């Protein structure tokens, strides 16, 4: 968090431990490192800047965390010089554009990464858990086990089968995502797939869906996945799935 205000001669911040930082200069930068997901509410008067840290649900009716798979030195599937991590991120950034453009102040959306970084699996799921997210969506792309080019193609969505009996749970969310993705992309449905062994699925405390948009080991699908227009269609489908889930009671 960086907070700059040229108008204030004195700046003061107090956290829960009553830690105080003050600066008498005309310009200051306050940098705060937090171990949880919070929203900043800032007010000021002639002398002070006051900051309150609120939980996401104190600000928003609904909270979503969206994860772009892999990143950094973990490229994911790689074919013909195309890295899965880049496609995952491109789609998620286009989802972000849709939420930013909509400006829906009732929904708070957080992203595990918006650049070529590689948060640990623990950091990714911790963000969702600490934010008290209502939904956790992770975006990936698939490949065959051998990694060889193949005719196998299509969209699959993974869910937590250990929580399959829950109403409005992971399995139902996965089905919503699958239906929206295949309808928008015209891709083959590979169904919803059990994924409890996947760390972020197993440890998420809310309904989670891990979307495998397509197969990078299929030439036609690889070409589409690397196409910006197709990425926009995938992003729109994810956006639609999130709002559909809310409409269905999540």
Language-model features and meaning:
Residues 45-179, 183, 187, 223, ...:
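Catalytic-core regions of hydrolytic enzymes
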Residues 14-33:
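Structured beta-strand segments within beta-sheet-rich domains
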Residues 141, 145, 189-250:
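Active-site-adjacent mobile loop/cap segments within catalytic or ligand-binding domains
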């Amino acid at each position: 968090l960086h907070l700059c205000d040229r108008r204030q001669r004195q700046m003061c911040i107090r956290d829960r431990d009553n830690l105080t930082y003050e600066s008498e200069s005309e310009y200051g930068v306050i940098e705060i490192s937090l171990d949880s997901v919070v929203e900043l509410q800032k007010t000021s008067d002639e002398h002070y800047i006051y900051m309150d840290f609120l939980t996401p649900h104190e600000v928003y009716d609904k909270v979503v965390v969206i994860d772009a798979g892999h990143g950094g030195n973990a490229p994911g599937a790689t074919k013909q010089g195309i890295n899965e991590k880049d496609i995952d991120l491109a789609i998620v950034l286009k989802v972000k554009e849709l939420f930013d453009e909509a400006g829906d102040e009732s929904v708070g959306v957080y992203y595990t990464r918006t650049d070529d970084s590689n948060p640990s699996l623990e950091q990714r799921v911790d963000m969702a858990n600490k934010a008290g997210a209502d939904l956790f969506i992770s975006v990936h792309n698939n490949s065959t086990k051998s990694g060889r080019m193949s005719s196998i193609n299509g969209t699959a969505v993974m869910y937590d089968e250990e929580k399959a009996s829950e109403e409005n749970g992971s399995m139902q969310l996965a089905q919503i995502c699958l239906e929206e993705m295949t309808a928008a992309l015209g891709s083959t449905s590979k169904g919803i797939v059990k994924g409890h062994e996947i760390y972020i699925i197993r440890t998420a405390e809310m309904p989670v869906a891990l979307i495998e948009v397509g197969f990078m080991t299929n030439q036609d699908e690889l070409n589409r996945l690397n196409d910006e227009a197709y990425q926009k269609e995938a992003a729109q489908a994810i956006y639609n799935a999130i709002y559909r889930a809310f409409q269905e009671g999540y």
